[in-house]
């Protein structure tokens, strides 16, 4: 069962028998999964709309079951991986499984709208020549 850190608090308070208002806590309790009562089959989302000196570029992703879709904002492309068969994400299956990619794209887009996610936008102070010369993004150091 895939988990994400925001599930930890919900799981701990559930295990402790504490009731909390649903609207105040992100994440889902995994206590029923830990007790063997059920499997979790829900999407897990990542959203990183920023650039980082370490080389990270804006992307969003969703994992549902064995499948993971990554949307790259710079190139406006998607990558699709079957994590059961390819945990290292080496073989992009976007062209081989277009229906699965479209399905996960719809799930991701719906979630981005639901949470009113900030989408990346162009940085008017970005200097491509400086980045190539220094390896750093203009305006971030």
Describe the role of every protein-language-model region.
Residues 1, 6-83, 114, 133-134:
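C-terminal cap/loop subdomain of S1 sulfatases and analogous C-terminal strand-loop tails that border
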Residues 8, 54, 64, 69, ...:
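Long, internal low-complexity/basic segments
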């Amino acid at each position: 069962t895939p988990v994400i850190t925001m599930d930890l608090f919900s799981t701990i308070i559930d295990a402790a028998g504490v009731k909390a208002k649903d609207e105040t806590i992100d994440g889902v309790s995994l206590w029923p999964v830990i007790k063997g009562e059920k499997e979790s089959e829900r999407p897990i989302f990542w959203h990183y709309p920023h650039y980082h000196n370490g080389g990270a570029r804006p992307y969003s992703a969703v994992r549902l079951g064995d499948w993971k879709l990554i949307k790259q904002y710079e190139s406006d492309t998607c990558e699709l991986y079957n994590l059961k068969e390819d945990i290292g994400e080496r073989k992009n299956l976007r062209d081989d499984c277009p229906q699965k990619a479209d399905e996960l794209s719809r799930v991701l887009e719906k979630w981005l709208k639901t949470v009113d996610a900030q989408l990346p936008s162009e940085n008017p102070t970005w200097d491509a020549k400086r980045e190539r010369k220094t390896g750093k993004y203009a305006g971030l150091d």
